[in-house]
C-alpha cells in the first residue's frame, strides 16, 4: 500500500462509481477511518503534512440540511444556519413545542431523525419504527415539520414530478441521476 517512490499511501478518489456522484475512495478507502477507537486514532495519527505544508480537514456538518436549505430556498433553515443555531434543537423546539433552552437530548435526537428522515423521504411508518412511536404520531411530526418548512415539501414534489417527466433528476452541479420506476411522460 505504500508507494515506493513517494513513501506515502495514496488512495484513488472517484465520482463515477456512485449513482449520486458522491466521492468514493478505494485502495485503500481513506474516507471511513474510525475515530472513536484506539486503532482508529492510531491510524489517523499517521496522517501528517510534508514540511511547509498543511492538511485540511473539513467537517461538512449537517451538509444535507444545508443543501436542502439552499436548493429549496428554505428561509427558516437558512436563517437558523446563518445564526449558528443548533438546527436539530430548533426543529425539536418547533415540532415538539419545547423551548430550546430546556432541550432534552432525547428530544433533540428525535428531531435529528426527523430532519434527516424527511429529506431522505422517510414515511410515517419508517419514522414510527425508528423513533418507537405510533404511526399517527409520526405523521403528526412530519406534518408539523412540513408546515414549518413548506419549501421542502414543494421542492420534493417538484423534483418527483421532474423525475416522472424526464426519467432523471439534476444535482445542484448539473449531474443527471437517472431514476428507474417512473413512467417518462
Model-predicted segments: where are they?
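Catalytic nucleotidyl-transfer cores of nucleotide-processing enzymes
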Residues: 1-90, 94-109, 125
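Conserved catalytic core of nucleic-acid polymerases
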Residues: 10-11, 15-18, 93-185
